[in-house]
Swiss-Prot record:
Gene3D superfamilies, A to Z: Argininosuccinate synthetase, chain A, domain 2 (3.90.1260.10), HUPs (3.40.50.620), Single helix bin (1.20.5.470)
Catalysis performed (reactions): L-citrulline + L-aspartate + ATP = 2-(N(omega)-L-arginino)succinate + AMP + diphosphate + H(+)
Name of the protein described by the UniProt record: Argininosuccinate synthase
Record's keyword terms, sorted: Amino-acid biosynthesis, Arginine biosynthesis, ATP-binding, Cytoplasm, Ligase, Nucleotide-binding
Organism in which the protein naturally occurs: Clostridium botulinum (strain Langeland / NCTC 10281 / Type F)
Annotated residues for binding of L-aspartate: T118, N122, D123
GO CC terms in record: cytoplasm
Pathway participation: Amino-acid biosynthesis; L-arginine biosynthesis; L-arginine from L-ornithine and carbamoyl phosphate: step 2/3
Oligomer status and interactors: Homotetramer.
Main location: cytoplasm
Keyword field contains Membrane: no
NCBIfam families per record: argG (TIGR00032), PRK00509.1 (NF001770)
Length: 397
């Protein structure tokens, strides 16, 4: 009986040609696993294609709700970003995929897990660290670090040679990653920074200048930092993301053209569509500004950046990630209320906040006197606060 390898399978270019390559070079029984995180593919087609390409079996794991509840909710509550721009759509999906790969490897008693990540990318780290953190005895096969194929053009040629159909041509060469949270586009003419990215690549977002001419008003209700209602309607977690993707997309919301510093050392360029995430972060930030005290609000921004880098670097299965989540959950205890946004041609304008947990007090914040604050109090505060500056000036050195 042949030994088994579990392949992270998408039906795209890389994983499509890996099946015959594994059989040719390793003589392994290939078990394909497609983890459905909302990439929008025809799963019946993916199943058929995997078997036609030579897999002995394929699992399709629908984990969209788990993706939202156990991963994207953490993104929203923490407002995690990498380098202030990237909303981590790929990064949050990879640990869940790694988890499912290990589960099926155990079920099938497979000794190997294989992925189609390139040797220059971050995903190879995310997958492999995720696997090692769960089962360090499983061996990894990473074809892009081994085989003679050096480019996507070479991969297309190999696919033709072995008779594998692929949804990419040399004329349309972008590498695309899609899930409920985002769509990313990399490669091709994007690698030349002098090239403006082409708007016809978008999957979810209407170009802002072509978006509708009337503004859209949107209300999002959060409960302990998690979105539960859209425009007054309770929706399940997956439907909330889908609905906000539609609303944001038709208003030109959520396009980012980013140069990022990869974990493996080089810079890369990606075009990202994240309409739901962009809306949720904007609304959540506004609600936090009203419900969190000054010191928690400011410190959480530092933690959010650390969390974003940790997730980007593939360190999901760590004590630090769990500890940060515990801190974030504590901060979200009173992040409950409704935020109203105005959307227009790529722009988001927060209009109002309605929450019973507001730390903003109109009576104190107005220009008049109040029981808690007297204008006269300011003089003593300023004298103490500015004392170091005054001493420095008096010393005159």
């Amino acid at each position: 009986m042949k030994e088994k390898v579990v392949l992270a399978y998408s039906g795209g270019l890389d994983t499509s040609i890996i099946i015959p390559w594994l059989k040719e070079n390793y003589d392994l029984d290939v078990i394909a696993v497609c983890v459905n995180v909302g990439q929008g593919d025809d799963m019946d087609y993916v199943k058929t294609k995997a078997i036609k390409s030579g897999a002995s079996k394929i699992y399709v794991e629908d984990v969209k709700e788990e993706f939202v509840v156990d991963y994207l909710y953490k993104a929203i509550k923490s407002e995690a970003l990498y380098e202030q721009d990237y909303m981590l759509g790929t990064s949050f999906a990879r640990p869940l995929m790694a988890k499912k790969l290990v589960e099926i490897a155990h079920k099938e008693q497979a000794k190997y897990i294989c992925h189609g990540c390139t040797g220059k990318g971050n995903d190879q780290v995310r997958f492999e660290v995720g696997v090692k953190a769960q089962d360090p005895t499983i061996k990894i096969i990473a074809p892009w670090r081994i085989w003679d194929i050096k480019s996507r053009e070479d991969a297309i040629d190999y696919a033709k040679k072995v008779g594998v159909e692929v949804p990419v041509t040399k004329k349309k060469i972008y590498s695309v990653d899609r899930n409920l949270w985002h769509v990313s586009h990399e490669g091709g003419d994007l690698e030349d920074l002098k090239n403006e990215h082409k708007e016809d690549m978008y999957f979810m977002v209407t170009p802002p200048e072509k978006a509708k001419d009337e503004p859209t008003y949107l209300e999002i209700y959060f409960e302990k930092g998690v979105p539960v209602k859209i425009n007054g309607e309770f929706l399940n977690p997956v439907d909330i993301i889908d609905k906000l993707n539609t609303i944001g997309g038709e208003n030109g919301i959520g396009i980012a053209d980013i140069i990022e510093n990869r974990l493996v050392g080089m810079k890369s360029r990606g075009i990202y569509e994240t309409p739901a995430g962009t809306l949720l972060y904007a609304a959540h930030k506004k609600l936090e500004s009203v419900t969190l005290d000054k010191y928690t609000y400011q410190y959480k921004k530092l933690v959010s950046a650390q969390y974003g880098e940790l997730v980007y670097n593939g360190l999901w299965f760590t004590a630090l990630r769990e500890a940060i989540d515990a801190f974030v959950d504590k901060t979200q205890e009173n992040v409950t209320g409704t935020v109203k946004l105005k959307l227009y041609k790529g722009n988001i304008k927060p209009c109002s906040v309605d929450t019973e947990y507001a730390l903003y007090d109109e009576g104190i914040s107005s220009f008049g006197e109040s029981e808690l604050y007297s204008h006269k109090d300011a003089e003593g505060f300023i004298n103490l606060f500015g004392l170091p500056c005054k001493i420095k000036a008096l010393k005159n050195f």
